[in-house]
Swiss-Prot record:
UniProt remark on domains: The Q motif is unique to and characteristic of the DEAD box family of RNA helicases and controls ATP binding and hydrolysis.
Pfam family, one: DEAD
Gene3D superfamilies found in the cross-reference section: P-loop containing nucleotide triphosphate hydrolases
Catalytic activity: ATP + H2O = ADP + phosphate + H(+)
Annotated compartments: Nucleus
Family: Belongs to the DEAD box helicase family. DECD subfamily.
GO MF, one annotated term: RNA helicase activity
Assembly behavior: Homodimer and heterodimer with AIP2. Interacts with API5.
The protein's name: DEAD-box ATP-dependent RNA helicase 56
């Protein structure tokens, strides 16, 4: 079968979209806080979040290709997976069809691959010819400005000599195929897998559920180097098959999407504290004194509270930095880079950074103000431990409405969030 032209797929990109966030005067419990800054007019702003692929620090060539497609708004799966995937981390992800999971491994592979003549650097396996064909063309679409990167697809139904000739005369850097054909080429030494650095299974449960196909995948896997990135994706991923997937991986980042297409994160220690509004500042001070952390993000509900709390923390000898919509885009970017580079350990922020801020060293999130929904809560606390490391989330509960949201979180995500104990084991939230 001859390779055809590219077909559409749901991959998204945007030019930093405008949002609005609440502007409110005063910190209700800020007895020790400085006076509020001048009123800030509620307005649109350009957000520092990964609502566009540019915030993932992708190659300009990839961003240009995405922009050419005219896609916007990365899906939640892309928000959560891509920052980990482009760093070479093992990933296991369950996401419904149409949620853009293909883009995760296509973009992350293209971002990382260093093409060397005659060497296959990335291998993608899937269970059908049609899917292999589609994936190959997604690679071609997004590598259109990376002419040095060669992609090829191999599957049954095509005379194997054609594939052998291609491998001999114009060896691709990225190979997509079905296990049977890939294994045949590898066994006959036409396809060398000794330089593969990215090993990807799409619709992995379909391949690993079938014993025959699983044997093929295992044999192929053993032909690749031990030191490589492994990513697995599927539209359905039962609890029974997940342990099988993990046998191929080392401490993978796990992301699962439920029936309502919302994101569920795992492995985060979560607690709440019941207190009055006036007690928040003192309790926050105590927590920052008592907890061990690399970096911490403190979420508040408005621009004025972010500015106030940041000033208060600095006055209390906690070197903090804040990001909110009352700043220019340039100032927000500068502050974000300062925090990302570790110049500051404490970030006070609004929901402006509730999505897509991916900083490996952040291991604690504190909800100084309760978010307004379970989904917002999820995205906030997901800032901690985002690269497979341990994390801790602490939420202040000071009103009946706060309790309502906390209950919604527990019901929605089937998680039991307990009150913060007097003593908490550092090993539960600090990377070893």
């Amino acid at each position: 079968m001859a390779e055809a032209e590219v077909k559409d797929n749901e991959v998204y990109e945007e030019d930093l979209v405008d949002y609005e966030e609440e502007v409110e005067n005063g910190t209700d419990g800020g007895a020790n806080a400085a006076n509020a800054s001048a009123d800030v007019v509620k307005k649109g702003y350009v957000g520092i979040h990964s609502s566009g692929f540019r915030d993932f620090l992708l190659k300009p060539e990839l961003l240009r290709a995405i922009q050419d497609c005219g896609f916007e708004h990365p899906s939640e799966v892309q928000h959560e997976c891509i920052p980990q995937a482009i760093l070479g981390m093992d990933v296991i992800c369950q996401a419904k069809s149409g949620m853009g999971k293909t883009a995760v491994f296509v973009l992350s592979s293209l971002q990382q691959i260093d093409p060397v003549a005659g060497q296959v650097g990335a291998l993608v396996l899937c269970h059908t010819r049609e899917l292999a064909y589609q994936i190959c063309h997604e690679f071609e679409r997004f590598s259109k400005y990376l002419p040095e990167v060669k992609v090829a697809v191999f599957y049954g139904g095509v005379h194997i000599k054609k594939h052998k000739d291609l491998l001999k005369n114009d060896c691709p850097h990225i190979v997509v195929g079905t296990p049977g054909r890939i294994l045949a080429l590898a066994r006959e030494k036409d396809l060398s897998l000794k330089n593969v650095r990215h090993f990807i299974l799409d619709e992995c449960d379909k391949m690993l559920d079938s014993l025959d196909m699983r044997r093929d995948v295992q044999e192929i896997f053993k032909m690749t180097p031990h030191d490589k990135q492994v990513m697995m994706f599927s539209a359905t991923l039962s609890k029974e098959i997940r342990p099988v997937c993990k046998k191929f991986m080392q401490d993978p980042m796990e992301i699962y999407v439920d029936d309502e297409a919302k994101l569920t994160l795992h492995g985060l220690v979560q607690h709440y504290i019941k207190l009055s509004e006036a007690e928040k500042n003192r309790k926050l001070n105590d927590l920052l004194d008592a907890l061990d952390f690399n970096q911490v993000v403190i979420f508040v509900k408005s621009v004025s509270r972010a500015a106030e709390l940041n000033k208060l923390l600095c006055e209390c000898n906690f070197p903090a930095i804040s990001i909110h919509s009352g700043m220019t885009q340039e100032e927000r970017l500068t502050r974000y880079k300062n925090f990302k580079e570790g110049h500051k350990r404490i970030l006070v922020a609004t929901d402006l950074v509730g999505r897509g801020i991916d900083i490996e060293r952040v291991n604690i999130v504190i909800n100084y103000d309760m978010p307004d929904s379970a989904d917002s809560y999820l995205h906030r606390v997901g800032r901690a431990g985002r690269f497979g490391t341990k994390g801790l989330a602490i939420t202040f509960v000071s009103s009946a409405s706060d309790s309502d949201v906390l209950n919604q979180v527990q019901e929605r995500f089937e998680v039991d969030i307990k009150e913060l104990p007097e003593q908490i084991d550092t090993s539960t939230y600090m990377p070893s």
